[in-house]
Amino acid sequence: MTTSPGPVYETAATTDDAALTFRGVDHVSLTVTDLNVSARFYTEVLGFTVVLDFGYGLVCIHKTTGFTLSLIRHPDGTGTRFTQRQTGLDHLGLTARSRAELLGWEQRLRDLDVEFTPVRDSELGHHLNFRDPDGIALEFYAPNDRYAAALDELRSRKFSDEELLDAAEQLGLGAYVARRVS
């Protein structure tokens, strides 16, 4: 029996990658059922500060990372809890420095009565999963040393698509690596 390579994805052609790109994630907006409950969670549990209140939504900034999170309450929203099985967001992943830091977060979540799944190890690092009051899936992720080094190198210079795919294979994840159509 032969194993098939990972899925094949076609890479879109661009005329000038340097001129047409994005610099990072500006913000994430989450739809919530109760702005006050969600604001309390994101400020008390994760350390965000509410900086703008539009009535229907709040803009929160994390003072250490500068990450911007918007909490939106749609007046015609369904009021149902989040499920990652519906098309859209699966989870919001936040970076942690180490497995030890994840254990510290575990204790903080425990102290604040936030349900969580204990730290788990994966091929590329360690993760701690929990949910906000609307059931939105959140994750702290700490890359292992090998993956962290690969990420640092990726951030340090521009790579071709083929180099990125080769780097993914070198992480030992060959069966999961997407292949580009030539």
Predicted features along the sequence, with ranges:
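Short beta-strand/turn micro-motifs at beta-sheet edges
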Residues: 14-18, 77-83
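A generic structural signal for short beta-strands and their flanking turns/coil linkers
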Residues: 56, 67, 88-90, 112
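Core segments of cupin and vicinal oxygen chelate
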Residues: 19-20, 30-75
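Vicinal oxygen chelate
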Residues: 2-18, 24-33, 80-182
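A short local loop/turn or secondary-structure capping micro-motif enriched for an aromatic residue
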Residues: 68-69, 76-80, 112, 145-149
